[in-house]
Amino acid sequence: VNMPPGQAHKFHRHPAMEEIIYVISGTAEQWVDQTKQILGPGESAHIPTNRVHGTYNAGDTELVFLAILSPAIFEGPALVDVSEDAPWSTLRDE
């Protein structure tokens, strides 16, 4: 994923998939549930199945990262957007 400054994958969840975020370059503000961590190149985060999470470009340069989701085959929605729901809509200033 190539994410320009100020862009994001806002809060969402994957009902049937877990995800690993691996930062190649730039700075990611990674949320898993209501916990935030800052990730730099070579760092990663694991998001368990059905956990709310969001990835934000926290830097002034492009954020480049791998988003690895598993399993690849499942039934139901791949992504559920919760960015407008409480408490997710109030966790950060935009």
Q: What role is predicted for each listed range?
A:
Residues 1, 54-94:
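Double-stranded beta-helix
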Residues 10-11, 30-31, 47, 53-59:
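Short beta-strand His + acidic residue motifs that chelate non-heme Fe in jelly-roll/DSBH
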Residues 16-28, 33:
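Glycine- and acidic-residue-biased ligand/ion/polar-headgroup-sensing regions
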Residues 34-50:
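Short acidic-glycine-tyrosine-enriched beta hairpin
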Residues 1, 21, 45:
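Conserved GNAT-family N-acetyltransferase fold
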Residues 1-14:
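Conserved short histidine dyad/triad with adjacent acidic residue
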